[in-house]
Design a protein with these regions (language model features):
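Short, structured coil segments at secondary-structure junctions
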Residues: 59, 135, 155-159
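A short, glycine/acidic-enriched catalytic loop
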Residues: 105-134
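Disordered regulatory segments flanking catalytic cores
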Residues: 2-32, 41, 217-249
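Active-site-proximal C-terminal subdomain of hydrolase catalytic domains
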Residues: 140, 145-229
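Extracytoplasmic/secreted proteins, especially bacterial periplasmic and envelope-associated proteins
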Residues: 43-50, 54, 76, 80-87, ...
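Solvent-exposed loop/turn segments at secondary-structure junctions
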Residues: 38-42, 70-74, 105-110, 119, ...
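Structural recognition of the beta-strand scaffold that forms the well-ordered cores
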Residues: 31-34, 64-68, 99-103, 139-144, ...
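Boundary/activation segment at the start of structured domains
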Residues: 22-96, 174, 179-182, 236-249
Length: 249
């Protein structure tokens, strides 16, 4: 499947929650993994790095990895993502710790695009669910963009909070070279999550910001979604809350 077949872009962030706090000694341990999957547009590299830093600070993560594909290096493949997840989970308590996996990329109704060398592969919702299920991590959060509503059904449950920048039938916006954030990434990570450590509150604020921006530019609503995570709220509550983080342009 070629990149031109993908409509708009996708920012997918997966957070497998298996506790790991830095802020509260007795709380859950958190690992944050972020990947920018399309190197031909620098926004995905910038967003992966920025999102990882902000989420890690909010959750008090000890283990933080930001690994994007770039214009000169494209070694983040579907297999590499799976290997990184397994490495992180091997150091965690699978029942009680938190793994956050952030993926930012182009996308389609079939999943997210991964530039593997000269090829473009698709990481599907079922493949992602299989990867996370195979490592045995219980608690997870998924955050994504274009058509990312397709990830809700396979991944959202009481132990998995899924946040998407668009529903299953629409794209999200802001995918272009030489900018730092996509629309949803800017609203959720760079704005709302800097003000609050509450992911649900941050999502609601980000959804309103994105809608206002879409109206201004007369764009078809991306309709961000949130689902699942009933058991995640208590875990995140144990990490405590950091003070407001300064906004970045």
């Amino acid at each position: 499947m070629i990149l031109s077949k993908l409509i708009k872009f996708v920012t997918l962030s997966v957070v497998a929650l298996t506790v790991m706090p830095c802020i509260v000694a007795a709380g859950p341990n958190v690992a944050v993994l972020a990947f920018g999957l399309v190197g031909s547009e620098s926004v995905f590299e910038s967003e992966a790095k920025g999102a990882a830093a902000i989420l890690a600070q909010r959750l008090g993560a000890h283990d933080v990895v930001a690994r994007p594909n770039t214009k000169t290096r494209r070694d983040v493949t579907i297999e590499a993502i799976g290997a990184a997840v397994r490495t992180a989970v091997d150091k965690m308590d699978r029942e009680n710790d938190l793994l956050a996996l952030i993926l930012t990329s182009h996308g389609s109704p079939d999943g997210v695009a991964v530039e593997a060398g000269r090829r473009v592969e698709i990481l599907s919702p079922s493949a992602l669910a299989s990867t996370l299920g195979s490592v045995g991590v219980r608690h997870r959060i998924i955050i994504s963009a274009c058509y990312s509503g397709v990830f809700l059904r396979p991944l959202a449950n009481d132990d998995s909070l899924v946040i998407t920048a668009a529903d299953a039938k629409h794209s999200s916006f802001g995918c272009q070279d030489k900018v730092k954030w996509t629309y949803f990434g800017d609203a959720f990570f760079n704005t709302a999550l800097r003000r609050t450590a509450d992911l649900r509150q941050a999502f609601n604020e980000a959804r309103a910001i994105v809608r206002q921006r879409e109206l201004h530019y007369h764009l078809v609503p991306s309709n961000p979604q949130i689902a699942g995570g009933k058991n995640i709220d208590a875990l995140l509550g144990e990490t405590g809350g950091a003070q407001a983080i300064g906004h970045q342009p």
